[in-house]
Amino acid sequence: MKRRDFFAAAGAAATAAAALPSAADEPTQGKPFQLGYAPHFGLFENLAGKDHVKQLEFAASVGFRDWEDNTMHMRPLDEQQRLADAMERLGIRMGVFVAYGIGSFGKLSFTGSDKKLRDQAVEEVRASIEVAKRVNAKWMTVVPGAFNNRVEEGFQTARCIDLLRRCAEVLEPHGLVMVLEPLNWWANHPGLFLRETHQAYEVCRGVDSPSCKILFDIYHQQIQEGNLIPNIDMAWDEIAYFQAGDNPGRKEPGTGEINYRNVFKHLHKKGFEGIVGMEHGKSLGGAEGDQALIDAYRAVDDF
């Protein structure tokens, strides 16, 4: 065999071998992750099937111990209970569902002065208490609606704080926490009030309640402001929850520009024991995409 042909054949064999799962890799499949990464329904349906309990069981079998479901509050009560029972059996911790935000992004509920809209926001948060208790959730997402183009931002901030204090008073006796999620203007949600970390920090300091904290979505904040680790550090004492997604594309870590291994290593070093929601899609379809997602989290959790 010619020397050139030998090296070509050797290289092809090495590539093929690397693509196969090794025996050493197999035990890591069910090993818990170092951080509390929380998938959502649909991410594993190619490998686990469409039944939600089967997806929970599959997630637990490959090492996930947390879950989130934005629309949990919209599911039938018997389905909520079925999922809660399955999570308890599997040792899965429930993350966020949306208490206020779905269908309300365009409303001036928190930044306006309409009493009806403001009272409605409080009642939606109140209605979430029973859902949280049923599914053993501690955190719920709140998005404080639209930016008010007719009012100075400082006045909007004050109005937002006032209304969030009312919501916090409803949640505090139950030990529940609403997490405020800043959302980016440039790719997904132009015109929303809460968009940057310093804003969310200012608002939470103003509300001054253990029931009002920040949901730091790494995808959104990379687009809106960048400077991820320093901003996380600055707002650390008000952050209760994280979500992930790479940019551009909002797919699994490793498909974009964010150094997720370093970000997650930083969270772990700071002692974060909460949830990192996997609020993103997959870069590949079918069972291959499901497995690529698992592999991506194993890779960025390797620190």
Label every PLM stretch briefly.
Residues E45, V98-G101:
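Short glycine-enriched loops at secondary-structure junctions
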Residues R82-R89, R166-V170, N231, V263-H266:
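Catalytic-core regions built around general acid/base machinery
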Residues K54-M72:
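Catalytic domains of carbohydrate-active enzymes, especially glycoside hydrolases
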Residues K2-A60, L194-F216, H220-F303:
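Histidine-acidic metal/acid-base catalytic patches
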Residues E68-E88, P144-N148, N188:
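Glycine-rich, proline-tolerant flexible connector loops at the mouths of alpha/beta enzymes
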Residues A10-A19, P27-K31, D51, R89, ...:
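Active-site acidic/histidine proton-transfer and metal-coordination neighborhood
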Residues F64, A132, A137, I239, ...:
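A structural motif
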